[in-house]
């Protein structure tokens, strides 16, 4: 993968929908896929931009199919293209900022929404979260209303 062609996004569009309909045999070398996912989970600490892709791929560590290997390979190609990118923390005011979003009915299996948030202290990203909501929201507004209550628990922890 050293000389591979890089891609501009860590995950292909509609990958979650495609991977949810996996058919066919499980990958022969299960350990190799699991070790790759472990390494990518460690990498999330310094590359928060791949967090969603790693989360999606790691949900299939027990029974990965060929499409999951393609997704992992795509993620490695993205990382190859961003090898010189870095997070930059500058000195500034130490104000805490939080950003919240909700993805309505994003899970195609149970139609539960996902709440996401991130917090910065000054210009430094100090915490981020992406969690599936426990109840099924009937509208976008309801999903957006549930998200802040989940995030308040995270703020108390900070």
Label each residue range with its predicted role:
Residues 1-158:
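Long, low-complexity, charge-biased intrinsically disordered regions
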């Amino acid at each position: 993968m050293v000389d591979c062609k890089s891609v501009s996004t860590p995950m292909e569009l509609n990958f979650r929908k495609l991977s949810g309909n996996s058919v066919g045999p499980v990958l022969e070398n299960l350990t190799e896929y699991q070790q790759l996912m472990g390494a990518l989970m460690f990498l999330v600490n310094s590359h928060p931009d791949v967090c969603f892709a790693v989360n999606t791929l790691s949900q299939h560590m027990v029974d990965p199919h060929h499409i999951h290997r393609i997704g992992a390979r795509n993620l490695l190609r993205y990382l190859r293209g961003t090898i010189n990118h870095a997070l930059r923390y500058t000195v500034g005011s130490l104000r805490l900022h939080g950003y919240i979003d909700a993805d309505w009915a994003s899970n195609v299996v149970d139609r539960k929404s996902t709440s996401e948030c991130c917090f910065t202290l000054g210009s430094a990203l100090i915490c981020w979260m992406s969690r599936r909501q426990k109840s099924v929201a009937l509208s976008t507004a309801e999903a957006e209303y549930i998200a802040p209550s989940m995030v308040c628990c995270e703020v108390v922890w900070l």
